[in-house]
């Protein structure tokens, strides 16, 4: 089972906060796809950062669609409960932890606030099916997944992501994952030293 931590990639979260959020925060509905979410710390970390930056009223418009192939069949239950052991939450800054977590009945386990849990929905999903979760996404985040695919598969999946982003939507992947040449023209790079890309105008 994939074991991940909250706030594991703080640099990417800060990039989304500083470079992506200002461009999408005024939209009536903000749909985000976290493709390859594992046990949930990544989409929940993103939700916390967005809530901190947006405030309650705007954050109500956010929906994060978290998906994973989840061969264990256990991720959905973990994400829906929103209960995590101490070792997974220990990197969260103290004030943020105090705002969004409370002690659970189990020793050294903590439960996320309903406000954060309620903005996430989980689906078991295989990216290679090339079937998107929806077609009006402001942001697609896919980290540590594409590296497991062949170059041809990566191109197909990124084309699928591109097709479901709204005009000016964003695609974020890990820093070591460069865009294949076949799809690089579909996006403009927002941050030169990070894999934050924006759908080019006129590219349907």
Language-model region placement:
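Extended basic-aromatic, gly/pro-enriched interface segments that bind polyanionic ligands
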Residues: 56, 60-141, 145-149, 153, ...
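Short conserved AdoMet
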Residues: 25, 84, 166
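Conserved class I S-adenosyl-L-methionine
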Residues: 28-45, 64-65
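Conserved AdoMet
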Residues: 1-33
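Conserved SAM-binding loop of SAM-dependent methyltransferases across substrates and taxa
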Residues: 39-57
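Core SAM-dependent methyltransferase catalytic element
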Residues: 139, 180-204
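Conserved beta-strand signature within the Rossmann-like core of class I S-adenosyl-L-methionine
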Residues: 167-175
């Amino acid at each position: 089972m994939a074991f991940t931590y909250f706030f594991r990639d703080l640099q990417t979260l800060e990039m989304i906060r500083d470079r992506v959020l200002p461009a999408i925060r005024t939209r009536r509905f903000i749909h985000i796809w976290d493709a390859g979410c594992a046990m949930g710390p990544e989409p929940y970390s993103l939700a916390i950062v967005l809530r901190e930056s947006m405030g309650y009223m705007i954050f109500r418009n956010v929906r994060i669609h978290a998906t994973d192939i989840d061969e264990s069949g256990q991720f959905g239950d973990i994400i829906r409960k929103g209960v995590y052991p101490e070792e997974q939450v220990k990197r969260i800054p103290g004030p943020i932890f105090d705002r969004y977590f409370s002690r659970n009945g189990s020793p050294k386990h903590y439960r996320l606030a309903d406000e954060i849990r309620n903005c996430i929905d989980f689906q078991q999903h295989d990216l290679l099916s090339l079937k998107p979760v929806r077609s009006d996404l402001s942001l697609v985040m896919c980290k540590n997944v594409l590296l497991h695919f062949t170059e041809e598969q990566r191109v197909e999946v990124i084309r699928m992501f591109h097709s479901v982003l709204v005009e000016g939507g964003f695609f974020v992947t890990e820093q070591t994952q460069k865009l294949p040449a076949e799809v690089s023209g579909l996006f403009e790079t927002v941050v030169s030293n990070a894999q934050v890309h924006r759908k080019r105008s006129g590219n349907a």
